Amino acid sequence: MDEEHNIIMVTTNYIPGKKITRIIGTIWGITVRSRGLGGNIVAGLRSLAGGEIKEYSKMLSDTRNTAMERLRDAAEQVGANAVIELRFDSSDIGQVMTEIVAYGTAVVVEDVSSDIQRVGLS
C-alpha cells in the first residue's frame, strides 16, 4: 500500500482482508516519453556491444513510475481507496517516443469485519 496516498494497488481482483463496497470503474495513468537524440546515440552505441541498454531500462522504469503516480492521482480524484486488476500497456509513437499506460478498476474497500464467525465443516 502506498502510505502517502493511502491507495491500495494490486494486480489481483480482490484484496485479502478487504471487501469491495463500491466499484467505480476503469481509470488510467498515461505518460509519453522520448529518449532524445543524445540518449538515442549513446544507447545505439551500447547496442553494438550487446547486453542490457541501461539508458532505456532506466527511462522505462521512470516512465512506469510516472504512470503509476498518475493512476494513484486518478483513483483519489474519483474517490477510490484501491485499484484492483492493475495492468500496464505500452506502445511506440513514431520511432522515438514510448507511451506507457497503467490502468485498473477503481474501487472502494473496507476491512472485513472481525466479528463474523467462520463455520467449519465437521
Curated annotation (Swiss-Prot):
Gene3D superfamilies in alphabetical order: Hypothetical protein apc22750. Chain B
InterPro entries found in the cross-reference section: UPF0145_dom_sf, UPF0145_YbjQ-like
SUPFAM superfamilies: YbjQ-like
Family indicated by similarity: Belongs to the UPF0145 family.
PANTHER family for the chain: UPF0145 PROTEIN SCO3412 (PTHR34068:SF2), UPF0145 PROTEIN YBJQ (PTHR34068)
HAMAP family per record: UPF0145 (MF_00338)
Full protein name: UPF0145 protein TV0671
